[in-house]
C-alpha cells in the first residue's frame, strides 16, 4: 500500500509542476500501474511521476528511510514471536513502506528517470542488507522493463518476491491491497 501511495504522490507532484508551468508535459499521463509477473516472480509498482535523480535516491532511500527502518523492524520482530504477525504490524506503518517490501521480496530494484533536465536514469538494487548497488541505468535495464519510450520520467519499483511472500504473486491478494 505504501509503495502505491508513494507512486500516487509522485504523479500528483508532476501534475502540480505541469499546472504551474515548471515543467512541460501532459498531466493526464500521470498514472500508476501495479504489474504482477507470476512467472518471473516480480511485482512492479510503476508511476509516471516526477522520478528521482541518483542524489534523490541516495537521500530518500539510503539515508532517510533506511536509518529509521532498521531500528523499527528490529523492535517489531522482537515483540512478535510469529513472523507473520510482525510483517502485518510493520506493513503500512508510516515511513516504513519502502523497507517493508523486504518482508516479501528477496531483492528490490528501483529504476527511476528524474523529471529534471540533465539527470541520468538511475538504478538502485538491494537484497535487504545494509549493502546496495546504485548507478546509471543501462539500456538493457530499460528494455527489460518494457516501458514506453515516450514516458521517460517516473519510477519503477520491482519487488523480486521470495518464498515467504509467495501470496503476493496472486492476483486476488494484490487486488485486496
Residue ranges of model-derived segments:
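Short, flexible catalytic-loop segment of classical short-chain dehydrogenase/reductase
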Residues: 173
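GHKL (Bergerat-fold) ATPase N-terminal catalytic module, capturing the glycine-rich phosphate-binding loop
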Residues: 1-163, 168
Amino acid at each position: 500500500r505504501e509503495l502505491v501511495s508513494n507512486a500516487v504522490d509522485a504523479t500528483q507532484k508532476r501534475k502540480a509542476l505541469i499546472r504551474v508551468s515548471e515543467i512541460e508535459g501532459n498531466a493526464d499521463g500521470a498514472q500508476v500501474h501495479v504489474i504482477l509477473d507470476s512467472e518471473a516472480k516480480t511485482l512492479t509498482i510503476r508511476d509516471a511521476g516526477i522520478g528521482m535523480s541518483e542524489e534523490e535516491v541516495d537521500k530518500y532511500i539510503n539515508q532517510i528511510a533506511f536509518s529509521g527502518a532498521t531500528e523499527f523492524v528490529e523492535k517489531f520482530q522482537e515483540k512478535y514471536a510469529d513472523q507473520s504477525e510482525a510483517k502485518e504490524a510493520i506493513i503500512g506503518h508510516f515511513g516504513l513502506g519502502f523497507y517493508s517490501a523486504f518482508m516479501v521480496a528477496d531483492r528490490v530494484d528501483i529504476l527511476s528517470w528524474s523529471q529534471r533536465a540533465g539527470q541520468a536514469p538511475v538504478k538502485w538494487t538491494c537484497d535487504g542488507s545494509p549493502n546496495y548497488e546504485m548507478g546509471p541505468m543501462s539500456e538493457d535495464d530499460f528494455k527489460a522493463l518494457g516501458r514506453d519510450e515516450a514516458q521517460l520520467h517516473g519510477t519503477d519499483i520491482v519487488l523480486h518476491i521470495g518464498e515467504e511472500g509467495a501470496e503476493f504473486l496472486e492476483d486476488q491478494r494484490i487486488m485486496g491491497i
